[in-house]
């Protein structure tokens, strides 16, 4: 890949869920481009405590504290990436899901972004510039029956992102969404290992079964966190200055429809 080692020089970025997986891929790419990056995570690895803020973004108080700390440390935020998210496996199907199950999915996958945007956007409006990316999921287009609240929340996040882009474009702020498919993060790899142990098959065979379970991946392999990081870096850079309100699917071709 072409390197753009100084394209984000002088810019600051905040990334939620940025210590592992896709979030780390995004953070690493923005740092490589010269950005000053803070990441938010539930816990702070000792070795990275200088650029990590411990935050529970599933609560209003947690998001408020994160926004205040990030602005205090960075002064202003030019790039905001909402990567945090999560899905749980429901037992008993949709009818067994409680209001608490739904609220938890909405708090983590939708309201975390809404609340943090509310804290950070005013500064962007004052400066007349900024770039936001909301990380959604192909489940918003191809939902699985085992994670219905998650899929619904990500669909809502996509629509929120589009509406927000329409509001903020005249103010010089761009908003886009990135929709990843199966990306082999640390947790995804562990899942493949566990499947392999349970079924007495290799990790490669387990990975193939996972890909088949989502309808296959035409490119033949899972994505990498760095792949998503490269896409996000493009979208928040000046190279994408005329792009806003878009959703970019990065799934190796998993979603067959347009």
Feature locations, PLM:
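Short C-terminal tail/terminal secondary-structure segment
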Residues: 2-5, 91, 142, 221, ...
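Short, small/polar-rich loop/turn modules that mediate ligand/substrate recognition or access, typified
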Residues: 169, 174, 243-245
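Substrate-binding pocket helix/loop in short-chain dehydrogenase/reductase
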Residues: 91-94, 98-106, 132, 213
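Conserved glycine-rich cofactor-binding loop
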Residues: 12, 19-20
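Active-site helix of classical SDR
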Residues: 117, 153, 161
